[in-house]
């Protein structure tokens, strides 16, 4: 694996902290939702770490009421604002706010001149057709370094998908000259932490 020792330590820290909070979410979220009103868009401030990322879909905040897909397929308005719908959403999308706005990378804090992309920047969209990898590193304005590592390992009709560090694949291929193209108005303002290994994904020949 193309990770440096410091990056491995960063990853271990992320996993330990987030794993603890994810376990706590099963206790905290059911209680926190008792303090929410129907028209609320967020959990009470003291519980904010346990809501999903504060992203907007169709002009509506997804923090506790779900994104557009959730509203379309599972709980259409206004049923998405019921206790049950919110509970299911938050237990499915645990500590998104923490992973995004506390430990995540704020796009405005990235030094565009520091971005380095190694490997195939399009690896995330090949549907597992070919094995490969991409690693993106950057330095924040405060000097801290962040990385995102994505790897696909194909075997037969299936493949293993690995994504570690921060979701920097969103800026794969970016540099000081084109960075603004990766930070449009409707783009996410924070890039989450990630530690995901899916060993059994079916190859999609369409590359999706």
Outline where the language-model segments fall:
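Short helical patches
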Residues: 5, 9, 16, 27, ...
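N-terminal topogenic membrane-targeting module
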Residues: 30-114
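Low-complexity, compositionally biased segments
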Residues: 42-43, 55-61, 123, 173, ...
């Amino acid at each position: 694996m193309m990770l440096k020792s410091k990056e491995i330590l960063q990853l271990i820290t992320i996993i330990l902290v987030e794993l603890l909070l994810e376990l706590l979410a099963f206790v905290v979220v059911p209680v926190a939702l008792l303090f929410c009103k129907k028209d609320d868009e967020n959990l009470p401030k003291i519980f904010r770490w346990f809501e999903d990322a504060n992203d907007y879909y169709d002009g509506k905040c997804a923090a506790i009421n779900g994104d557009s897909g959730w509203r379309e397929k599972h709980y259409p308005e206004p049923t998405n604002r019921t206790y049950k719908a919110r509970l299911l959403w938050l237990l499915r999308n645990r500590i998104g706010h923490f992973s995004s706005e506390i430990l995540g990378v704020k796009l405005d804090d990235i030094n565009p001149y520091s971005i380095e992309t190694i490997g195939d920047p399009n690896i995330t969209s090949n549907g597992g057709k070919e094995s490969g990898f991409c690693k993106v590193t950057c330095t924040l304005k405060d000097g801290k370094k962040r990385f995102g590592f994505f790897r696909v390992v194909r075997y037969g009709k299936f493949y293993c998908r690995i994504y570690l560090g921060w979701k920097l694949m969103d800026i794969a291929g970016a540099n000081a000259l084109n960075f603004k193209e990766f930070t449009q108005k409707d783009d996410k303002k924070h890039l989450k932490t990630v530690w995901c290994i899916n060993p059994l994904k079916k190859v999609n020949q369409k590359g999706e």
